[in-house]
């Protein structure tokens, strides 16, 4: 299992109780460093924290790009969890929702993903310095349409905040 956008690893820990191994990824190196040190002190070997910036993950590195393969060539997870991450990639880094969902479709047969609604406080904060209309397609209806093109939704749940929905979906075909 991969936990993309793991932050402090709370959900990675929960997932590790139900999974053989969790790769916990985040684009914040300080968060990953803290998680690594905490897991090391606990002697927790079921979670591997990795610094990964999906918006600039690149290919392999080393001689001829082959010494260490890029993250997408290191294995395919049975399930990916992406909580509190897609709005950052869409709004901050301008990666369209469709492209993100294509990546997830190509990566994993099962997905747990959180979609913050347009009225979510963090979404509004991220949009503060963006010109009007640039992210009009960032909304729950469009996300569900795009998700349903690529995945079959097994379940969805509105979180208590009322501004985020979590989906569990399996890849079509």
Please annotate each region the language model reported.
Residues 134-150:
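Short alpha-helix
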Residues 81:
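A conserved beta-strand element that flanks and buttresses the S-adenosyl-L-methionine
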């Amino acid at each position: 299992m991969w936990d993309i956008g793991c932050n402090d690893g709370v959900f990675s820990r929960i997932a590790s109780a139900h999974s053989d191994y969790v790769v916990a990824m985040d684009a914040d190196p300080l968060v990953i460093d803290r998680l690594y040190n905490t897991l090391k002190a606990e002697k927790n070997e079921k979670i591997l924290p990795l610094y990964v910036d999906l918006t600039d993950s690149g290919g392999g590195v080393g001689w001829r790009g082959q010494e260490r393969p890029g993250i997408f060539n290191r294995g395919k997870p049975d399930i990916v969890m992406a909580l509190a991450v897609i709005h950052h990639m869409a709004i901050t880094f301008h990666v369209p929702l469709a492209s993100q969902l294509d990546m997830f479709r190509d990566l994993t047969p099962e997905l747990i993903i959180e979609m913050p609604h347009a009225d979510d406080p963090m979404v509004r904060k991220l949009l503060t310095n963006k010109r009007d209309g640039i992210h009009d397609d960032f909304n729950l209806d469009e996300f569900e349409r795009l998700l349903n093109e690529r995945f079959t939704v097994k379940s969805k749940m509105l979180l208590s905040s009322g501004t985020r929905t979590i989906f569990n979906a399996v890849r079509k075909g």
